[in-house]
Swiss-Prot record:
InterPro entries: NAD(P)-bd_dom_sf, SDR_fam. The gene is ausX. The active site is at Y189 (proton acceptor), Y189 (proton donor). In A.calidoustus, the austinoid gene cluster lies on a contiguous DNA region, while clusters from E.nidulans and P.brasilianum are split in their respective genomes. Genetic rearrangements provoked variability among the clusters and E.nidulans produces the least number of austionoid derivatives with the end products austinol and dehydroaustinol, while P.brasilianum can produce until acetoxydehydroaustin, and A.calidoustus produces the highest number of identified derivatives. It comes from Emericella nidulans (strain FGSC A4 / ATCC 38163 / CBS 112.46 / NRRL 194 / M139) (Aspergillus nidulans). This is Short chain dehydrogenase ausX.
Length: 197
């Protein structure tokens, strides 16, 4: 597994696109049960990408489609028409804070593309309104943790058995550099965005 950190804060699509091109040439090895990991996109690879309606998720989906991949895009908001109309893009609307959403995402991918998942890009994320610990509501805490941390873990749990059957697959978990520095505000976001080992 490889973790991309530091990039969620960028808002420029050109910077995001440049960042996402890193995926094209990256080779990473995995220590988990001979599961090979490669970020070399080839035509017809099937990818699940969360957060495809804006930001890094949109840039990653656009790049993957340009490379010939088939993408199941997941977001709570509908994607831009330019993405939605692409022949190799299928949108699945889901609120990743709901406990059953990750399983439904993988079921939708299987219905659309069969029992093949070559990659999972966990990019969707939410902020916590920069609330400090003494003003943080339970709802904001739970939403940040469920979308930024729990949903990616559940999605990995769903796709790894499929990847093991094929003997290969790639997982990218996008984290934030905010998790590596302390601050008075942003407690839930910081806790939920720590890069995983």
């Amino acid at each position: 597994m490889f973790i991309i950190s530091q990039y969620r804060e960028h808002r420029s699509l050109s910077i995001l696109t440049q960042t996402c091109t890193i995926f094209r040439s990256m080779q990473v090895s995995s220590k988990h049960e001979n599961l090979s990991v490669s970020f070399h996109l080839t035509p017809l690879q099937v990818l699940i990408i969360t957060g495809t309606s804006s930001g890094i998720g949109l840039a990653a989906a656009t790049m993957a489609l340009e490379e010939g991949a088939k993408v199941l895009g997941v977001d709570i908001s509908k994607p831009p028409d330019s993405l939605a109309r692409h022949a190799n893009y299928q949108f699945f609307q889901a609120d990743l804070s709901h406990p059953e959403a990750p399983a439904r995402v993988v079921e939708a991918c299987s219905r659309t593309y069969g029992d093949r998942i070559d990659g999972l890009l966990n990019i969707a994320g939410v902020m916590d309104l920069n609330q400090s610990a003494d003003s943080l509501s339970d709802n904001v805490w739970e939403r940040c943790i469920s979308i930024n941390l729990t949903a990616p873990v559940k999605l990995m749990r769903e796709v790894i058995p499929i990847m093991k059957l094929r003997g290969k697959g790639s997982i990218v978990n996008v984290a934030s550099k905010a998790a590596l520095s302390g601050a008075v505000s942003g407690v839930a976001y910081t806790a939920s965005e720590h890069p995983w080992p």
